[in-house]
Amino acid sequence: MTLTGCVDYYEIIAGTKVAVCRNAIDNKTVATAIAATRTVNGNDDPFVVMNVSTIMAKVIQWQRTMPRVAPCYAVKCNDDKVLLRTLADLGMGFDCASKAEIEKVIGLVGPEKIVYANPCKTRGFIAHAEAAGVKRMTFDSVEELTKIKQNHADPSLILRISVSDPTAQCQLGIKFGCDPETVAPKLLRKAADMGMNVIGISFHVGSGCNEPATFRTALEYARGLFDLGISLGLSMTLLDIGGGFPGVDTAHISLDACAAVINPALEELFPLDSCPDVEVIAEPGRYFACAAVSVTTNVIASVKVPASRITEKADDVNRDGYMYYMNDGVYGSFNCKLFDHYQPRGMPLAEHDADEPRFPVCVWGPTCDGLDQVEESSVMPRLYEGDWLYYPDMGAYTSVAASTFNGFDKPKTYYFIDEATLGSIVRKADSAPRG
């Protein structure tokens, strides 16, 4: 990549070349430089840009906002090796859901910093966790409890309860977690009878939480179950408040809004003076991954249609609208639209005058599937074949689930970081014990 005026030198992180800039720059600036070089070279392939500096900024924000809560990054959200290495260097733990995810991070951190947070595991995966030294794992049924006992000699168990935000982007309570009132007490008693080591309670209010008050409800249930567990002789030293934290702050939801509920609830229900041995962790994914990544695509066709075809308003039949076809779609980077209920919103990479006409547009991916629509109805300037579209905030549940359906390759990723942030990460990594 040629980024004249942007990149001063390169460093290798996780075996990958990362551009280092002496001054801080943003994703769009880097994407513009890459696109310009590609256009000159006749390369119109889509590409991804990851700003490693953004990852550290999110870590700092978390530590300032919820200092008592230690984040364990949800690997499922984005398993990019530069992202994982950066988070590990910054002292992060990891939430893993499978054997493969454990394998991705076991060389980065010690097994004590891994939570196997999948309440339904195969016997082989449980045995693998034992071999890898991973003890902390979740369960939500007597069947899973029995399975773990039969396949792991020394597990540290975390009971997952179901407390869900009904407005969350992705509902998880319908699949995982037991009822905190009717089932959870029975499972704690059963675990105690079986001589199993239950160390705490976990919950997940739903990926993409919109109602932070749900955290308070879940913490109240957790407090009651902690008390029961302690009365049964269980150690109860871990509280896992799950994920659901926003990747980008909006008028409706922010990390501050979540913290405004969580921090006082922890102080009231799990005060440090009476609960000094209770470790509080969380499982954020999109919070760390989303804003660091952008996707830039190329318009491969621009087709004029009656605007009514897009807006579905009969009055727009005589207005112009456009269907933009681009070379990445829902089978690639934009699978988040189908699987994560995310609504990507793109913009022209090139600047357009404010008084330039805007038109109703829909944006299609490149495959033959009619389902491959990234934006149903948006408003954009007139774009032409060969123009570039820029999509910010695309790091969560995107590349990790991308496919090569119809023979379309996954986009290449470019990485950059500013020099000051790189120095901070290196110093942090050098001062921390390596797992």
UniProtKB/Swiss-Prot annotation:
It catalyses: L-ornithine + H(+) = putrescine + CO2. SUPFAM superfamilies: Alanine racemase C-terminal domain-like, PLP-binding barrel. The modification N6-(pyridoxal phosphate)lysine is found at residue 76. The record marks 204 as: Stacks against the aromatic ring of pyridoxal phosphate and stabilizes reaction intermediates. The active site is at residue 368. One of its GO terms (biological process) is putrescine biosynthetic process from arginine, via ornithine. Keywords: Decarboxylase, Lyase, Polyamine biosynthesis, Pyridoxal phosphate. Pyridoxal 5'-phosphate binds at residues 207, 244, 283-286, 397. Catalyzes the first and rate-limiting step of polyamine biosynthesis that converts ornithine into putrescine, which is the precursor for the polyamines, spermidine and spermine. Polyamines are essential for cell proliferation and are implicated in cellular processes, ranging from DNA replication to apoptosis. Belongs to the Orn/Lys/Arg decarboxylase class-II family. This is Ornithine decarboxylase.
